[in-house]
Each structure stands twice: as structure tokens, then as C-alpha cells.
């Protein structure tokens, strides 16, 4: 059911009306915003529907919003949920576009210079460009971002200057359009038409906007007049619709007008001269020669091409900022009436504060030893006090607010009662001596009921040994650790939900915001070892992972009750009592959370398809040698036929099946 609110551009898809503590929380937060409170805190327990409350606040106030999360996995989960709540509004995703990133660095002790090396994810880059386009074009915009939002991107005023407006009936020579596209960092490619390129055929210019994944623009000219503007599918060429006007946005956040580049080059030359003089005065001749050689090469590239490798290190000169001024970031693109939500704020806020310090330490060596000019230090993330100055009206969202949120809370809004009636997990304390075998018997009980288990240990070594031990005893177990990349982490969590394994072991990766309703047992090993992994906040967060299940239970293995354990148990008990009183008063029978299993960024996973895949794998495992050989020959023939008929996708699918069968055949030959 789609709901609209007065003076709000948002259409909220409301699968159910707010319940439990949600109506009061929504009302208090909206009231706090209209009263002009700069900061508020939503203290919401796991499973109380904090994301739904955020969506309601955005829809009712009608203001654009940015939601910040502390990692890509949680940001992707929030993005997916917000897209469901706002199917007709601009919900965008802004995270770091690097799949791999090795920053430039110098290690003086080994005289080792490490070149910058990175691999950019095209899909995420397109989503980032789409995010800035939506902010500039639409009032109904919601951006889900990570701390990537505090890193410098192009100056909004330069970005605005570079936008190309096209309108039917307008006089614009073809040469001017091509020239503008080139300065916007679009490249001409008449053969391979992809994102960020354009092609020219007679009087027709086809432009593939950098922020679009499936729509291109065809500009048909009659002499110097724009005759028609048409949107079409770049793959099939099918016309989608004719438009009267269209705005083409730059191909990168870092585009710069030509006169700005020339002005910046003069400033860089000036800084270089001063720096060489300083090195010579200090007797550092190697550094003087190094900085001159590197900077002159970059200047040559800037004059000829308009950009160079590592152009971000000269960003201060391009944006015209003074030394030490904050860089332009995504937050500068936000309209003045924007809202900010900081999800899992007890982790996200400290993370924002830590970003600048790490970056500054690395840059200091590069500047000192002549690899970069001093202005490179101003290509940096925001300092915490700069971030605070830019923050619009902000709502901190957390089950366990930290000191910063408590000090800055205009009001604290509690959302402790769950609409589903689910009660916080029951907590049991058991001795450490028998923890491994005791947990094994509990796991078997859960496996028999088709439920899942999360186990948190203190060290990687303990997690690995535990995973090996349980595997030997016939338990399907996986181990989650910091070396696993974002995409694989999402897949592991999805596989746990699908039942491809029953137990997930981790260290501190099980804490914030993992939404796994199938988990009925959380086990915390060595719970009495005080430290940040066993602090009151960590324990409450970890216990909360079982709060989405009807039979949720938390086992704390400890020989004594620490202060942190006592506080976590008291807080959980307080929440249990409040929920049970609410259930009794309203006659609510608790029911488990049912949640579709989604591909966090691209939509919804088909459980049936996954199960079919598992069945197919099992069928392969059952084949004898003769059947296997026959099946391989049949598939090879089918694959060649598909390739001859130009059915390449089908051929690729068969090839993957063949690979699986050949692996099985090879293993059986051993």
C-alpha cells in the first residue's frame, strides 16, 4: 500500500502500519526535527524495526536524507530495504568504488616507494554518479552511504558548471556538443559503446551517460539545431521514449573546466619552486630532484590531457581552497534541508573520527621525502570537527548508544518494544571448561529443527580450530574473518540463511546489524574476558543477533560474571520485561520474523534456484564413471551446437556444468 503525506514528495510503500513503540518513536522524532533539534538518538533494539521508523520519518518530513553506515555490507542491506519502502523515489548507494586499493606510500627504513594501485568497480562507480545526479535533480532523494562520504570528491560548483543541458529546437553546433562531452571526460568510441562514451554517425550523436546502467541518449541534429532527443536501450537499440530536454552529467566527479586547469598549473609551478628552494636550503638534493621530476611530468600531462595519474593530490589547487581548508565531499552536495541518519552510531561515529589520522600519517612521509608537494596533505577525508560543522539535523540510530551520542542527544527516543511481540533472547551462563562439547550438543539440537547458530570467539586461531573440530564431528560450519572481502561476506551470510551450512563462527564481525532471522542460538565463548570484544555494548549487540527468532537464546560461557556481563544481562532483562508487559497488555502472541532472502544490491535471490543448484550438485555427486562420461559427451555436443547457433549465454552455462562434471571425473580417476 503506497502512502503519501502533505508537502512530501515521497511515496512510502507501507506493508504494515507502525506498531509497538514505532508510532510514538516516529512522532517524537518528527516533532524533534520540527522543533529544530540538531541531534536526536533513536535507541532501538534489534528487530524493533528501526529502518522502518527511519523510512517513516523521511516520508513524513518530506526532506532528502543521507543514511550513513559503518561498512558496505550494512549499507547494502539498508539500501535494499529503503528501495522496498520507496519504490518510486530516488534511493541511491554511495560507497567506495574500489574493489582493491593500495595507496601511495613511502617506507623510509627500507627506502621503498609503493605506487598507488587500485581496481575500480564499474557498477559502484555508476551508482556513485547516479547518487550525485539525484541529489542535484530530485527533492525525493535518499542516499545510503558509508564513511566514503567524508572523502574528497570534485567541487560541486565545478561539477555544476560542466553539466550539459540539451533542449529540442535549440541551436547548438555538433562540434560544440562533441567538445563539451570531451571536457566532461566522455571518450569518443564508435565501436565499443559503453558507459561514459559517445559515438557520432552523421548528424546523430549517441551519448551513454556515466550514471546510467541501461539507458542512452540519441541527439538528432538538423544542421545546427537539436531536432529530437530520444532515450534508447544501448544493448538492443530499442527506443524507450522521446524527451523534450535532457541534462548530461559529467563522466567523473573530478571534472574541471579548462581555465581552472590552467590556473591550477600556475599555482602548482609556484608551489614547486618554493619547495625546491626549501630542499636545496636544507641540503636535501635527492628530494629536490625527485619532486621536480615527478611534478613536471604531472604538469606536462595536465597541460596536454587535462588530467594526470594522482590528480587528486593537486585537488587544493583545482578547487581554489586555502591550505588546511576542508575538501569538498558528498555532504557539500546535500541541500540545506537534508536529514542525516547515522546507523549503528556507536561504531560509525568513531570511524569518521579515525579516517583523517591514518591518512595524515601516510602523507607526511610522501611530502617529507619529495614524492609529493605539501598541498597533497589537503587531499584528505574530513577531520571530525569539520564533519560536525557540515552535519545537517542528525538522528543517531543504535541499540547501544556510546558516549558521543549521549553527550549530543537533544532527546533520546526509545524503541524497545517489537511489533512482532518477540522477546529478547533468554540468557544462560555455563562454565568455560566444557564450552566446546556443550555447544556441540546445543548445535545438534538446533540442526534437527533446521535453525542456525552464531558462535563468537576471541581469536582467529580459536575460531579456526573450532571450525575444524565441528567439521570433524559432522557439523556444516563456516568461518567469517577480516580477510574475507565484502561480496564474499554477503554470500556467506546468504548461504547461512539458505541452509547451505548451519553454524557461522566469527570474532567481532557478528555484532552490528546482521539481519538473520533463522539464527536461534548465539554462543559467546570466554564471555568473562574483559575487553572491547566483551564490553557491555559488544555483548548486547551480539546477544541481539538471536532476537529475531521465536526460540532465541544466548549462551555465555564464563566462570565469573564481569561488570560488562552484569550490565548487558540487566539491560536485556529490562527489555524482556517491557516487551512481555506490552504483549500481555495487548494480547500479542510472539511470532518469528520472516524475511525474503535477497541479493543485497541487485534485488531478490530465488531460493528455488539456489535449491535447484544444490539438487543438481547432489545428482552429479551420485553419478558413476560410465554415466559421468556419457553426460560429459552429451554436454560437449550441446555446447558446440549452442555456440554454432550464436547462443553464447547458453553455451557458457553448459561450459560451467561441464567444468563441474570434469572436476568430478578427475577426482574419481585419482
Swiss-Prot record:
Q: Where is the UVR domain?
A: 629-664
Query: Coiled-coil stretches, from where to where?
Result: none
This protein's GO cellular component annotations are:
cytoplasm; excinuclease repair complex
Residues annotated to bind ATP? 44-51
Enumerate the spans annotated as Helicase ATP-binding domain: 31-418
* Chief place where the protein resides: cytoplasm
Q: Where is the Helicase C-terminal domain?
A: 435-601
Please give a single GO biological process term from the UniProt record. Answer: SOS response
Could you tell me which Pfam families the record lists for this protein? Helicase_C (PF00271), ResIII (PF04851), UVR (PF02151), UvrB (PF12344), UvrB_inter (PF17757)
State the span of motif (Beta-hairpin): 97-120
Sorted alphabetically, which InterPro entries does this protein's record hold?
Helicase/UvrB_N, Helicase_ATP-bd, Helicase_C-like, P-loop_NTPase, UVR_dom, UVR_dom_sf, UvrB, UvrB_inter
Name where it's found: Cytoplasm
Q: What is this protein's function?
A: The UvrABC repair system catalyzes the recognition and processing of DNA lesions. A damage recognition complex composed of 2 UvrA and 2 UvrB subunits scans DNA for abnormalities. Upon binding of the UvrA(2)B(2) complex to a putative damaged site, the DNA wraps around one UvrB monomer. DNA wrap is dependent on ATP binding by UvrB and probably causes local melting of the DNA helix, facilitating insertion of UvrB beta-hairpin between the DNA strands. Then UvrB probes one DNA strand for the presence of a lesion.
Question: Which family is this sequence assigned to?
Answer: Belongs to the UvrB family.
Q: Which PANTHER family match?
A: UVRABC SYSTEM PROTEIN B
Q: What is this protein called?
A: UvrABC system protein B
Q: Which organism is it from?
A: Chromobacterium violaceum (strain ATCC 12472 / DSM 30191 / JCM 1249 / CCUG 213 / NBRC 12614 / NCIMB 9131 / NCTC 9757 / MK)
Amino acid at each position: 500500500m503506497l502512502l503519501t503525506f502533505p508537502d512530501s514528495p515521497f511515496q512510502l510503500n507501507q506493508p504494515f502500519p507502525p506498531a509497538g513503540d514505532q508510532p510514538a518513536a516516529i512522532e517524537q522524532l518528527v516533532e524533534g526535527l520540527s522543533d529544530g533539534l540538531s541531534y536526536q538518538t533513536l535507541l532501538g533494539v534489534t528487530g524493533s524495526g528501526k529502518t522502518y521508523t527511519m523510512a517513516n520519518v523521511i516520508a513524513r518530513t518530506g526532506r532528502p536524507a543521507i543514511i550513513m553506515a559503518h561498512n558496505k555490507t550494512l549499507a547494502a542491506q539498508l539500501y535494499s530495504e529503503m528501495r522496498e519502502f520507496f519504490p518510486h523515489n530516488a534511493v541511491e548507494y554511495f560507497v567506495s568504488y574500489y574493489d582493491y586499493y593500495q595507496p601511495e606510500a613511502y617506507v623510509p627504513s627500507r627506502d621503498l616507494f609503493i605506487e598507488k594501485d587500485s581496481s575500480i568497480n564499474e557498477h559502484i562507480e555508476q551508482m556513485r554518479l547516479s547518487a550525485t545526479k539525484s541529489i542535484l535533480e530530485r527533492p525525493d532523494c535518499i542516499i545510503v552511504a558509508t564513511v566514503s562520504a567524508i572523502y574528497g570528491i570534485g567541487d560541486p560548483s565545478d561539477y555544476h558548471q560542466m553539466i550539459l543541458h540539451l533542449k529540442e529546437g535549440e541551436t547548438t553546433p555538433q562540434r560544440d556538443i562533441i567538445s563539451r562531452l570531451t571536457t566532461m571526460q566522455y571518450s569518443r568510441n564508435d565501436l565499443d559503446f559503453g558507459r561514459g562514451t559517445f559515438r557520432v554517425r552523421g548528424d546523430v550523436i549517441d551519448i551513454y551517460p556515466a550514471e546510467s546502467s541501461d539507458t542512452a541518449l540519441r541527439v538528432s541534429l538538423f544542421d545546427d539545431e537539436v531536432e529530437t532527443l530520444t532515450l534508447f536501450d544501448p544493448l538492443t537499440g530499442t527506443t524507450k521514449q522521446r524527451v523534450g530536454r535532457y541534462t548530461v552529467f559529467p563522466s567523473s566527479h573530478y571534472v574541471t573546466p579548462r581555465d581552472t586547469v590552467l590556473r591550477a598549473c600556475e599555482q602548482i609551478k609556484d608551489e614547486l619552486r618554493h619547495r625546491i628552494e626549501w630542499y636545496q636550503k636544507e641540503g636535501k638534493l635527492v628530494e629536490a630532484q625527485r619532486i621536480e621530476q615527478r611534478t613536471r611530468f604531472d604538469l606536462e600531462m595536465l597541460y596536454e590531457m587535462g588530467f594526470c595519474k594522482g590528480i587528486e593530490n593537486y585537488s587544493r589547487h583545482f578547487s581554489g581552497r586555502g591550505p588546511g581548508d576542508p575538501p569538498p565531499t558528498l555532504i557539500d552536495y546535500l541541500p540545506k534541508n537534508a536529514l542525516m541518519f547515522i546507523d549503528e552510531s556507536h561504531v560509525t561515529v568513531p570511524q569518521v573520527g579515525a579516517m583523517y589520522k591514518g591518512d595524515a600519517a601516510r602523507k607526511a612521509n610522501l611530502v617529507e621525502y619529495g614524492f609529493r608537494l605539501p598541498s597533497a596533505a589537503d587531499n584528505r577525508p574530513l577531520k571530525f570537527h569539520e564533519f560536525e560543522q557540515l552535519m545537517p539535523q542528525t538522528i543517531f540510530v543504535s541499540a547501544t548508544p556510546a558516549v558521543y551520542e549521549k553527550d549530543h542527544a537533544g532527546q533520546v527516543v526509545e524503541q524497545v518494544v517489537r511489533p512482532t511481540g518477540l522477546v529478547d533472547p533468554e540468557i544462560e551462563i555455563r562454565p568455560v571448561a566444557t564450552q566446546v562439547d556443550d555447544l556441540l550438543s546445543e548445535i545438534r539440537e538446533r540442526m534437527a529443527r533446521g535453525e542456525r547458530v552464531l558462535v563468537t570467539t576471541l581469536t582467529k586461531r580459536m575460531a579456526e580450530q573450532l571450525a575444524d573440530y565441528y567439521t570433524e564431528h559432522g557439523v556444516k560450519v563456516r568461518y567469517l574473518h577480516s580477510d574475507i572481502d565484502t561480496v564474499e561476506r554477503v554470500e556467506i551470510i546468504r548461504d547461512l540463511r539458505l541452509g547451505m551450512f548451519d553454524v557461522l563462527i566469527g570474532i567481532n564481525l557478528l555484532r552490528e546489524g546482521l539481519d538473520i532471522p533463522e539464527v536461534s542460538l548465539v554462543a559467546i565463548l570466554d564471555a568473562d574476558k574483559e575487553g572491547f570484544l566483551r564490553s557491555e555494548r559488544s555483548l548486547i549487540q551480539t546477544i541481539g543477533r538471536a532476537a529475531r527468532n521465536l526460540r532465541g537464546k544466548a549462551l555465555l560461557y564464563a566462570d565469573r560474571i564481569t561488570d560488562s556481563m552484569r550490565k548487558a544481562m540487566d539491560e536485556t532483562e529490562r527489555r524482556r520485561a517491557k516487551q512481555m508487559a506490552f504483549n500481555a497488555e495487548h494480547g500479542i502472541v510472539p511470532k518469528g520474523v520472516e524475511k525474503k532472502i535477497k541479493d543485497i544490491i541487485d534485488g531478490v535471490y530465488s531460493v528455488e534456484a539456489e535449491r535447484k543448484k544444490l539438487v543438481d550438485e547432489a545428482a552429479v555427486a551420485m553419478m558413476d564413471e560410465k554415466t559421468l562420461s556419457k553426460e560429459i559427451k552429451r554436454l560437449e555436443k550441446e555446447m558446440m551446437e549452442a555456440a554454432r547457433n550464436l547462443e553464447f549465454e547458453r553455451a557458457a552455462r553448459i561450459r560451467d556444468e561441464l567444468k563441474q562434471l570434469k572436476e568430478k571425473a578427475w577426482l574419481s580417476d585419482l
